[in-house]
């Protein structure tokens, strides 16, 4: 399996939406895709038609000792969804303490699913530094850092790079990091200027295109689905497809170590 951790040092960059739509594109291309939510907001499921009143998820399953197979949902576009789940505050803290104490928890749990070498796991994480992001990076084959074309995102890049260097880069099976610029409005001069700076700074690590700002993204979420499913001919949908092709060209070139295949 290949594990893609979708991360960001700051909130409000559209990370969950990007993770959902990339998972959707990959699934429609014939890959088996697991969309795994490691964010307590439990929002990734909303893109895949998981019932709003469902409380099941990996947090509750882990605390109760249940197998993850029991909380896997068949989502739209053929994506298998592993929600975070709904837990009370005390249980959330217990869950966080557990995964902080068990750094191999995520990788071992994924291996229990007996995924094939070609299967893809897309992990959504909370913004910034957290036990969830650290856990995802400890299991990741590749990290995808989502940024905006603004000064705040530019300034936050070193923070996430330090986390990747600490928790992912030392592993021999980690294949590197990529960057994608989301919610781009090409009519703004500042956006164009920041894009130039990001391309100079990040070079080949940066997806050569962008994800354009598109009202269809919000509309698709309101319909409990992905943009790829809701409006496949939109500009952002084309961007997601191009980004997924670039992403998989990077990920598929990474050798899979024997220990990373269940």
Regions found by a protein language model. Give the residues of each.
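Acidic-aromatic/histidine active-site loop/patch
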Residues: 1-3, 255-262
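Walker A/P-loop phosphate-binding motif and the immediately C-terminal alpha-helix
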Residues: 2-40
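Active-site signature of alpha/beta-hydrolase-fold catalytic machinery across serine-
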Residues: 21, 25, 47, 135
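Phosphate-binding loop that captures ATP/GTP phosphates
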Residues: 41-81, 208
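Cytosolic-facing regulatory segments adjacent to core modules
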Residues: 83-130
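C-terminal boundary of histidine-terminating zinc-finger modules
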Residues: 221-239
């Amino acid at each position: 399996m290949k594990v893609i951790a979708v991360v960001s040092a700051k909130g409000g960059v559209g990370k969950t939406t990007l993770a959902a739509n990339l998972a959707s594109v990959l699934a429609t291309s014939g890959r088996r895709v697991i969309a795994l939510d490691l964010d307590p907001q439990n929002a990734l499921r909303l893109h895949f038609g998981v019932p709003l009143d469902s409380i099941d998820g990996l947090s509750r399953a882990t605390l109760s000792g249940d197998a993850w197979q029991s909380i896997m949902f068949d989502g739209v576009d053929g994506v298998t969804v592993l929600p975070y789940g709904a837990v009370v505050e005390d249980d959330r803290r217990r869950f966080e303490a557990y995964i902080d104490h068990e750094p191999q928890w995520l990788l071992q749990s994924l291996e229990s699913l007996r995924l094939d070498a070609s299967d893809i796991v897309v992990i959504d994480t909370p913004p910034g530094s957290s036990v969830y992001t650290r856990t995802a990076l400890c299991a990741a084959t590749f990290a995808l850092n989502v940024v905006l074309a603004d000064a705040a995102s530019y300034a936050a890049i070193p923070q996430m790079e330090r986390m990747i260097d600490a928790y992912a880069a030392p592993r021999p099976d980690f294949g590197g990091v990529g960057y994608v610029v989301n919610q781009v409005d090409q009519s703004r001069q500042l956006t164009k200027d920041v894009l130039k700076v990001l391309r100079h700074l990040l070079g080949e690590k940066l997806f050569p295109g962008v994800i354009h700002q598109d009202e269809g993204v919000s509309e698709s979420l309101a319909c409990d689905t992905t943009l790829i499913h809701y409006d496949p001919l939109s500009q952002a949908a084309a961007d997601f497809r191009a980004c997924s092709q670039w992403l998989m060209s990077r990920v598929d070139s990474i050798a899979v170590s024997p220990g990373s295949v269940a």
